[in-house]
Amino acid sequence: MDNMNSFVEYSICNRPATGAYSVPKSGYHSHHHLHHHHHPLDQNQGFPVTTGSFHTGLAASPAAVNGSRTDSSAPGAVYNPDGRLYGTAGEEGAHGATGTSQHHHQHPHHFPEQQPEQNGYSHPHLQTQTLQSGTLSHYNHGSSGSAYAGQSCARNSEYASTNTIHSHYYMEEPAASTYYHQSSFTSTAPTVGPSYGALAGAYCGPQGALAGSQYPQQLVGGLDAAGYLGLPQGGYGEPQTTQERERGGEEGQQAGQGQTFDWMKVKRNPPKTVKVSDFGLAGAHNSAIRTNFSTRQLTELEKEFHFSKYLTRARRVEIAATLELNETQVKIWFQNRRMKQKKREREGGCATPRTPSSSGFNKELEDTDHSSTSTSPGASPSSETSSERAA
């Protein structure tokens, strides 16, 4: 069986001018040599297999035709001056040259062991690997390490593809085990930008996860952005904190109200109740109850009224102490007596003679009590008593 090798040509994924994988160039012919139970290379994946002249890199010799040549001068993959990467593909189209002397004549079930030694071309029929992680695996962990160092967090436009790619994407083991699936994403960068932004964020560790969580609609797996970031469901973290603070403040107020201080006791003491004896009342003090004066009390009050219709406070206190009354009772009696006297004078029931002294005294009363007439201070008690009875 012919073991003629072919060259797989594809450009570096982070070139801004090209897509993720280049289309077949004109002038090259696809040439496959299939082994008995090996899987053929799928042309729909956009990986051209070209034959023709052998391409050499900057420091590498031509690759062997039968895959048996040993080239120790090339430390890793072969690059040409314009920056494109060339790798040899054998019967399976899945094994690249890494600078070691190997026969690339392996069966498909040995493919997982050869993954760290590949230049990034993954088998199209193995869904356990990714087109992206297979490309990044060698350059992040291999011997060369200069072309793809730090390219795991590339920009969204660097992953734009000119072909329609159907594949399954998995995150690498160090990142997480969340399953990402992008089905039938197409050419332009603005269309696939958000989805690749979420995917690239997954490769960047915790910082990338924060960036990837901005596009939760692109994550088809079971990853919840809010739960992954440690936030409570529904985003009600801050309102719950506010409610807890308010609840704590209310509890503090209740605890403060439970304590009774000395200044609070003073305010809470009830006011002193007025004694009934202060008003001379037998019942409730707020109800208008008529005071029953004795004959002796009435005689002494009438004598004082004849001498002076208006009492000073000192005289009122003295009379109240003598008659066993309070000041309020004496004051109210004198007010009622003056009103009665005015009523008599208005009706003309009093015709007593007036003296000059009484007239001068009446002028003083007019200024204070607005009364025009008054009984003379020299009137006999008998006549005053008779006038009260007539009234």
UniProtKB/Swiss-Prot annotation:
Name the UniProt key words of this record, in alphabetical order.
Answer: Developmental protein, DNA-binding, Homeobox, Nucleus, Transcription, Transcription regulation
- The entry's DNA-binding region: 286-345
Q: What PROSITE patterns does the annotation carry?
A: HOMEOBOX_1, HOMEOBOX_2
Q: Name one cellular component (GO) term.
A: nucleus
Q: Which Pfam families match?
A: Homeodomain
Query: Per its UniProt record, what InterPro entries does this chain match?
Result: HD, HD_metazoa, Homeobox_CS, Homeodomain-like_sf, HXA1/B1/D1
Where found in the cell?
Nucleus
Q: Which domain of life is it from?
A: Eukaryota
Keyword Transcription set for record:
yes
Segments carrying motif Antp-type hexapeptide: 260-265
Give the residue ranges for region: Disordered: 62-125, 231-260, 337-391
Q: Give an example GO molecular function.
A: DNA-binding transcription factor activity, RNA polymerase II-specific
Where is this chain compositionally biased, Low complexity type?
87-100, 371-385
Q: Does the keyword Transcription regulation apply?
A: yes
Which family, according to UniProt?
Belongs to the Antp homeobox family. Labial subfamily.
The role this protein plays is: Sequence-specific transcription factor which is part of a developmental regulatory system that provides cells with specific positional identities on the anterior-posterior axis.
Q: What is this protein called?
A: Homeobox protein Hox-B1a
Q: Quick one: which gene encodes this?
A: hoxb1a
